[in-house]
Amino acid sequence: MQHATDLISIIALGLVCAFIGGMLAQRMRLPPLVGYLVAGIAIGPFTPGFVGDPALASQLAELGVILLMFGVGLHFSIGDLLAVRTIALPGAIVQITVATAMGAGLAWGFGWGAGAGLVFGLALSVASTVVLLRALEGQGLLDSDKGRIAVGWLIVEDLAMVVALVLLPALAPSLGGEAMQAAGHHGPPEHGLWVTLGLTLAKVGVFVAVMLVGGRRLIPYLLGLAARTGSRELFTLAVLASAVGIAFASSELFGVSFALGAFFAGMVLAESDLSH
């Protein structure tokens, strides 16, 4: 009987290659993350040999980011995040603006159009969440003031990219692309742009409010129910269900990234007695 083993094969080969790459990188006195990246390239579609399913790999990567950001959120409280807002908020906005402008200028030098230049600049303006957090953990800086500022910076970048991804389709006509408007929409582009932007900001605001008000009560309560059963398995399952479920619901209902939803889930849990 033939079985579909795409998921098993990509997990098995991925873990084996990541282990080998991490060990080799450690022997060369490099961060293991370098070996993990090389392992990903080795089983990717642009190198000979085994090629992992890109769709499955992407979803597994998202799952890894969800669990990573949930764990990072457990190290933070809402007070920690608010304490660095005066640095992280303006700093991230200025950095995104400057990096986007520099990237767009470089693209203009390559002869690219305005739309391609803007997308290229935005891609250069944000940091890799996984790489930065792993580097902070490796240096023991995640729980320091610098680490909190860096995480706050990442949150601002994530929110900024949510807005950017909404605005880019609406701005496509003026940037040399094609508009992506909903079927049946015949209003003026300006009206559609501002309505879309307003709805996006409202969704993000509602998401933050729901997590800070409802999540601070609901998540600890549900985990408390699991803890009182005395079953370690049920408690672990409740934690995983909270991280993945909230991340998925946040993306589907409010349009935020999986990583941001998982981070807020971990952060609200950090303020409960069950965070350890």
UniProtKB/Swiss-Prot annotation:
GO terms for cellular component: plasma membrane. It is a multi-pass membrane protein. Keywords: Cell membrane, Membrane, Transmembrane, Transmembrane helix, Transport. The chain crosses the membrane at residues 5-25, 32-52, 64-84, 104-124, 149-169, 193-213, 244-264. GO terms for molecular function: antiporter activity. Signal peptide: none annotated. GO terms for biological process: proton transmembrane transport. It is found in: Cell membrane. InterPro entries: Cation/H_exchanger_TM (IPR006153), Na+/solute_symporter_sf (IPR038770). PANTHER family: CATION_PROTON ANTIPORTER YBAL-RELATED (PTHR42751:SF1), SODIUM/HYDROGEN EXCHANGER FAMILY/TRKA DOMAIN PROTEIN (PTHR42751). Belongs to the monovalent cation:proton antiporter 2 (CPA2) transporter (TC 2.A.37) family. This is Uncharacterized protein in phaC 3'region.
